Amino acid sequence: MELAIPDKKLKKALENDAERRKRFGSDMAKKLKIRMDSLAAAESLADFWPPASGPERCHEMKGDLKGQFSVDVKQPYRLLFRAQVTREAFDDERERWAAIKSIEILSVEDTHG
């Protein structure tokens, strides 16, 4: 998938190994790299469809974060992103997830805290 990171500070922290370790610590930096690499290697978000999501536990957010998705990084932190959808109507959710081939990384945060 195509990954965009509009926030310059977050982009620097996620794309540079030294900055990622400095900002998030060594263990979390490793897990963030794995998640970012997995997302970039995916053909579409359907590769993370919930029944087959694995350790990422990709899911859509609810409440104030509705419209965003998250993947687990290191408890309690999640990588939040917004999907770039090219059309509105889909027959089912899996089809909608398969149409998502570009995402915008928004933040790394504890969504329950």
Regions found by a protein language model. Give the residues of each.
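Arg/Lys-rich, positively charged N-terminal/basic patches that mediate binding to nucleic acids
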Residues: 1-37
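A short, surface-exposed loop/turn module that caps and links secondary-structure elements
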Residues: 44-67
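Short connector loops at helix/strand junctions that flank enzyme active sites
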Residues: 34, 56, 64-66, 74-76, ...
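Residue-level preference for alpha-helix termini and adjacent loops
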Residues: 2-4, 23, 47, 57-60, ...
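Charge-dense, helix-prone N-terminal extensions
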Residues: 6, 12, 25-27, 56, ...
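Enriched for short, Lys/Arg-rich terminal
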Residues: 69-113
